[in-house]
Amino acid sequence: GEGEKIRGLLGAGTSELSEFVSAPVVLDKKVMFPVANYGSAMAPFYTVLSIWVGAIVLAAMLKVNLTEERKRELEDLRDYQVYLGRMVFFIVIALLQSGLVCLGDLFFLEIQCEHPGLFLLAGWFTGVVFAVIMYTLTISFGDVGKAIAVILLVIQVAGSGGTFPIEMTPQFFQNMAGLMPFTYSMGAMRECIGGLYGSTYWISLG
């Protein structure tokens, strides 16, 4: 019985006893969604980060507001026409940016990706959403909107669960995580890298 095992252990040699003390329990591991390396695990965070920074640079380089002279030339302009006027161009550039980043992840960095097509789709969707956010902030508030975008960037880098589990961050960031776009974009990309779990991918994009 158990007594025999204990006596056998006590009577064993030093090496057997040290092995038991160092590892009294042997775990049987079964990895459900394995990730090949640290770079692949961090790819969603840095991909989403680069898309956001690209949107900030886009807003800084391109003019979003019409000049007063141009407004006089175009009579009877409505507010929604002014708003939508250059958004399409912003979105097209954002699609090119995000597509380039995601293709670089897949073919240059060669990250692990179980669903490359969905990964690219997540990148495009993220690019469009970030471009619309940046465009709206800029056309509504001007340079103040760009500053808001930078502040949001800092908050999301610290509080979106990109580098550490969100549960390990201060309570403020835990409360903010559900409101941050980074959280959902990274969630969708992680699904593509490690493997899909139910409808988590589509929920993250939705």
Please report, for each region that a protein language model flagged, where it lies by residue.
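Membrane-spanning alpha-helical segments of multipass transporters and channels
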Residues: 3-206
